Amino acid sequence: MKRIILSGMCALMFWAVPSLAQRGSREIPTPTDGLKDAYKDYFMIGASVNTMNVTDADQIALIKREFNSITAENAMKPQPTEPQKGEFNWEDADLIADFCRRNGIRLRGHTLMWHSQIGSWMYQDEKGNLLSKEKFYDNMKHHIQAVVSRYKDVVYCWDVVNEAVADGPVRPGRPELRESPMYKIAGEEFIYKAFEYAHEADPDALLFYNDYNDAEPAKSQRIFNLVKRMREAGVPVDGIGMQGHYNIYGPEMSDVDAAISL
């Protein structure tokens, strides 16, 4: 991880050089290789994109040069793809998926189940009452499998469930998971079911649990414990997605290393 963070700092330094050199008379050539080329023997380099990023010529050129994987920022989330039960809107997600197909860029699917940006029809009835577990599971299965099946030719991995672990100190007697409507209906089991439904739709896709503040020691341990329980229960989970909301003030590199090493 130290190598990854330091490489990002070096990249910023590299791009600062042309802006300074342009004050002189020398002409600085446009780079042809990007970060994806520098790290091709180690890992993929990705970015979060929206529809504007993949339709603007300058941004397209940058994406194609620097990245070999992209993630849809919002276009594949539950609310944008199925705002009402059975009424799908594929326009933005299709645009990003087609961009990846044309340019040979891999696509990370984000996200199939999240307490935010999700239609309330998924978990409650017209009167605002929570659905039974059976009805909720039926809605969730239909949604997940429709989305995964549509993009299985281009999406190589999915963030199946997003941000289900509670933040901060957990009070005695309270669950370690976020008390979302989905959790209130089915408890931790809804996470397991989401992964099962995604795996049924695309057995070849890598499936991840995704969250933020992963470098905070107490939360990283809760995330680790959740995924450990999932693995022990036979749930098809392949890894943990760590949202990199990092800046010069934090988190501490030692905490990031510790989270990865759990």
What do the predicted segments below correspond to?
Residues 1-24:
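Bacterial Sec-dependent N-terminal signal peptides
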Residues 24-69, 73:
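Boundary/entry segment of secreted carbohydrate-active catalytic domains
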Residues 32-33, 65-83, 92-215:
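Substrate-binding cleft and catalytic face of glycoside hydrolase catalytic domains
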Residues 40-41, 102, 153, 235-236:
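Short helix-terminating capping/connector loops at secondary-structure junctions
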Residues 46, 157, 239:
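Short hydrophobic-acidic sequence motifs that mark active-site Asp/Glu residues
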Residues 48-58, 78-91, 165-166, 213-222, ...:
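Acidic-and-aromatic substrate-binding clefts and catalytic sites of carbohydrate-active enzymes
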Residues 50-66, 93, 137-147, 218-230, ...:
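Short, acidic/polar
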Residues 68-72, 162, 201-211, 223-250, ...:
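Aromatic- and acid-rich polysaccharide-binding/catalytic face
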